[in-house]
C-alpha cells in the first residue's frame, strides 16, 4: 500500500537506473525505446497492487489516522529510514501516511 507513495517521495533522490530496472522487472510494456520516468514506476506498482488484490489505501485495511503518530515513531526506530534515498523526518512519514490514507 505504501510503496507507490514512497516511490513518489523518493523519486528525486533515488538512482533513476534502479527505478528503471525495477520498472522493467514488473512492467508488461517495457521497451527499449521507452522514455522512462520515476512516476511510471509508482503507477506500475499501483497497477500491480490492483492485480494482486492489494487494497489501495491505509483506510481500506482499517488503519485509522489516530494511529499515524505511533506508526511514524515505529518507522523512525526501524533501520529502514537510514537506507532511504531521500532524507526523511517524522513529519515526512506522517505526510506519506496521509497521502496513502
Regions found by a protein language model. Give the residues of each.
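Short, amphipathic C-terminal "tail helix"
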Residues: 64-101
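Gly/Pro-rich interdomain helix-loop hinge
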Residues: 1-67
Amino acid at each position: 500500500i505504501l510503496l507507490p507513495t514512497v516511490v513518489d517521495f523518493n523519486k528525486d533522490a533515488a538512482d533513476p537506473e534502479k527505478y528503471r530496472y525495477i520498472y522493467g522487472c514488473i512492467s508488461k510494456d517495457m521497451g527499449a525505446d521507452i522514455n522512462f520516468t520515476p512516476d511510471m514506476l509508482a503507477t506500475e506498482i499501483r497497477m500491480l497492487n490492483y492485480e494482486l488484490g492489494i487494497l489501495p489505501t491505509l483506510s481500506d485495511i482499517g488503519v485509522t489516522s489516530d494511529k499515524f503518530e505511533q506508526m511514524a515513531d515505529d518507522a523512525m526506530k526501524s533501520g529502514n529510514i537510514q537506507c532511504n534515498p531521500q532524507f526523511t523526518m517524522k513529519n515526512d512519514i506522517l505526510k506519506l501516511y496521509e497521502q496513502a490514507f
